[in-house]
Amino acid sequence: MSPGPHTAQFRGDGALVLVGDEWNRATASHSELPTILMLHGGGQNRFSWKNTGQVLADRGFHVIALDARGHGDSDRAPDGRYTVDTLARDITSVLEQIGRPVVIIGASMGGLTGILAAQQSGPQRVTGLVLVDVVPRFENQGTARIRDFMTRHVHGFETLEQAADAIAAYLPHRQRPRNLDGLTKNLRHREGRWHWHWDPAFVTAAGDDPFAKIEELEQATIDLKIPIMLIRGKLSDVVSPEGAEDFLAKVPHAEFVELSDAGHTAAGDDNDAFSDAVVAFVSR
C-alpha cells in the first residue's frame, strides 16, 4: 500500500505555477514503470483523480494528478487565455520536468490537451494515451450543457447547499452527498460567497473555437503511433456511440472500453470499473 500523495509544484508555459498531487516520487527514478500524468476536464481539478491515483500508486506507479492553469490551486493565466494550445504547452513543460516516459490520462479538456502534448513531445516521452470520454469530434449539445453549467453560477453561491443542489441538477445520476465538506475542494469562499475554484475567465473570456481545431486534433491523434485507449461513459452526451465508432475507424489501433454506469464524468461515475480499465492498460 502506497502512502497518500504529497503536493508538488511544476512550471507551466511562461513559468506559470501548476500544482499537483504526486505519489511515489522517491521511487520513480529507478522504476521500470512509466509515470502516469492525469489531466482533468474543464471545471474539474486534480481531486477528481484521487481514487484512481491511489490505485495506480498502490501498484507501484509514479503518479501525478495536475491542476490545469486557472483550476484548483494552479496559477491563473495572467492574460486570461485558456486555449488548448496554451494548455498543451504547459504539459510539454511538465513532461520535460518529469524527464522520464509518461502515460497521459486525460479527461475531456485534459484528453484534447494530452493529444497535442503527446504529438509535440514524441513517443519517447509520451508512451501511451488514455482519452476519458473525449474524441476530437465531440457532441456540441453535450459541451454546451457543460458550458451552461459553468457560466450559470459564475457569481457563486450563498451556501454549500446551493452548490450541492446545482451539482445534483447537473449530474442527476449521482447520489447527492449528505456531508458537503468535500465540496470545499471545488469551491473557494471569498466576500461572503462560495465560488468555483476555476478562473471565471476560463468560461467568459474569448478563446479558441474547439470546433475549429477538430481537423488538427483528429490528425494529431491519427499520427500518434503510441498505444491509445478511449474510455466512454455509456450515459455520455459528449461522446456519442457514432462519435466513438468514427474515432475507432480513424484510429484503428486504439482500444475501446465503455462503462455502463458512467456519463461524461466517467472517472468518478464508475470508479472501480474505470480504475480497472486504466490499470490493465498501463500495466502492459
Model region roles, listed by residue range:
Residues 26, 50-53, 58, 64, ...:
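Active-site loop/oxyanion-hole signature of alpha/beta-hydrolase fold enzymes
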Residues 100-140:
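Conserved hydrolase catalytic core segment
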Residues 259-275:
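Catalytic histidine-centered segment of alpha/beta-hydrolase-like enzymes
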Residues 190-249:
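Conserved serine/cysteine hydrolase catalytic core
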Residues 33, 41-44:
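Active-site glycine-rich loops that stabilize anionic/oxyanionic intermediates
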Residues 158-212:
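Conserved alpha/beta-hydrolase catalytic His-Asp/Glu region
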Residues 39-41, 232:
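The conserved beta1-alpha1 loop
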